[in-house]
Amino acid sequence: MANKKEEPGHSPLVNKKAKFNFELVSFIEAGIVLSGSEVKSLREKKGNLTDAFAKIKNGEVFLENFSITPYKNGGYVNHPEIRPRKLLLHKKEIEKLERQVKEKGLVLVATKVYFKNNLRVKVEIAVGKPKKIHDKRDDMQKKDAQQEIARALKSSNRYE
């Protein structure tokens, strides 16, 4: 069966800072409760996941600090830009996440928001451990070294 190509307007919103600030352990896909104008804004890629994280309250998971720009044609019924949004997970998944957060001191970070089957909005939540400053420096040094090697190889191939 051939894979369907993703439509250009529906590429996912990605939290690039999550990999830099956290050591991501596991990922879980969750649905999200949104209003109609929020879905329309997300179709136009008008969202920001940079500071988004999930919090467990009373056996429910909420996505905090997820900014969705108000829909330009929304009128007076538009949604607030930042508000807690409920995530849809099974009870066992919530209990598992709650145990990890309480026992191991891990954090729930939103890493990606995308449309599944061009209908439903899904959020990828990562369970992660915050990195220390020296870990971030090590990652930056490794990345710089890889870029130097790539540049050197590219320039050496150019003169052959």
Curated annotation (Swiss-Prot):
One of its GO terms (cellular component) is cytosol. One of its GO terms (biological process) is trans-translation. Its main location: cytoplasm. The keyword Cytoplasm applies. InterPro entries: SmpB, SsrA-bd_prot, SsrA-bd_prot_CS. Keywords: Cytoplasm, RNA-binding. Residues 135-146 have a biased composition (Basic and acidic residues). It comes from the Bacteria. Residues 132-160 are annotated as: Disordered. Belongs to the SmpB family. NCBIfam families: PRK05422.1, smpB. Required for rescue of stalled ribosomes mediated by trans-translation. Binds to transfer-messenger RNA (tmRNA), required for stable association of tmRNA with ribosomes. tmRNA and SmpB together mimic tRNA shape, replacing the anticodon stem-loop with SmpB. tmRNA is encoded by the ssrA gene; the 2 termini fold to resemble tRNA(Ala) and it encodes a 'tag peptide', a short internal open reading frame. During trans-translation Ala-aminoacylated tmRNA acts like a tRNA, entering the A-site of stalled ribosomes, displacing the stalled mRNA. This is SsrA-binding protein. It comes from Leptospira borgpetersenii serovar Hardjo-bovis (strain JB197). The gene is smpB.
